[in-house]
Amino acid sequence: MSSAGKLPSEVERTLVRKSGAWTNPAYGCPPEKRPIHEYIEKGVVNIDKPRGPTSHEVAAWVKAILGVHTAGHAGSLDPKVTGLLPTLLGKATLAVPALRLSGKEYICHLKLHRAMPQKLVRQVCEEFTGPIYQMPPIKSAVKRVIRVRTIYHLEVLEIEGTSVLFRVGCEAGTYIRKLCHDIGLALGCGGHMQGLRRTKAGPFTEKTLITLHELKDAYVFWKEDGDESELRRVIRPMESAVSHLPKIILRDSAVDAICSGASLAVPGITGLDSNLAEGELTGLFTLKGELVALAKAKMTTEEILKASAGIAASPIRVLMEAGTYPRGWTKKEEKVQL
């Protein structure tokens, strides 16, 4: 299937098997079955950010509601912007960089400074797909140098007078306000961003959005009634935040070494993404689906499948605690098919 027009997180991925594998049910557990305290500390909430507060304020409220020590959001939204604000909790905050680098999608209200022919508006908007040059706004927190950002798709949804509603999928770090300004310049009439809502952030969509009130209610139900079902619904395992990354599946015997910071050798791999590239950020997972670490691939899929030795990946951030799996465990208890 073609990946044209898709966000990176929407490109279909498949796993290929390198060798047979077994996992011991006595160690680790599927992410969705973690004890509730661990589930929270290794969770992510897809908050529907309201208009008004800053992204940091929303993340602080999430932290206060759940009583976690840390909470970090993946990609800031201006106070007036609404929509998806995935917020990672506790240990899961180590995965924030992986989510921040994923593609984003927005619905934007562009206000033209005078009415223009609809055919021309659509034509000009189409020309803004692909790589574009952007200079960060004057009020930006980053250095003002020209940068290249990719627009994966830009679809005009509605035009009424000087109002243009469009959907845009873009690379992280794209300034939609600047995009609106540049479209106005290209049309020769000028324009500015009137409103903006984020509808996708990496693997997260509006289907799993929750409000701060829903999060608070779910927490109260658990604390007062002992009912954790609603809390498990509104909080997702941290693995969902990196589901867009290529995967490498580890043997049980390789897990603890990775947790201690060791590089991943080829014999420790049982399966992997079919299109892994050297240097690519990848997720290292157990056979039960637990995220062990984020790593940088040192070999391609083809090289790993052919190799019997060598370093396949080097951990960048370790998210699983050492001792979760025994070192060098080899006893065959239960087979898991890829």
Swiss-Prot record:
| GO biological process per UniProt | box H/ACA sno(s)RNA 3'-end processing; mRNA pseudouridine synthesis; rRNA pseudouridine synthesis; snRNA pseudouridine synthesis; tRNA pseudouridine synthesis
Pfam families named among the record's database cross-references: DKCLD, PUA, TruB_C_2, TruB_N
PROSITE patterns, alphabetically?
PUA (PS50890)
Catalytic-site annotation from UniProt: 78 (nucleophile)
Looking at its record, which EC class is this enzyme? Answer: isomerase
Hey, which family's this protein in? Answer: Belongs to the pseudouridine synthase TruB family. Type 2 subfamily.
Q: Per its UniProt record, what CDD domains does this chain match?
A: PseudoU_synth_hDyskerin, PUA_Cbf5
SUPFAM superfamilies documented for this protein:
Pseudouridine synthase, PUA domain-like
Domain of life according to the entry: Archaea
Role according to the record: Could be responsible for synthesis of pseudouridine from uracil-55 in the psi GC loop of transfer RNAs.
Please identify the protein, giving its name as recorded.
Probable tRNA pseudouridine synthase B
- The record lists the organism as Methanosarcina mazei (strain ATCC BAA-159 / DSM 3647 / Goe1 / Go1 / JCM 11833 / OCM 88) (Methanosarcina frisia)
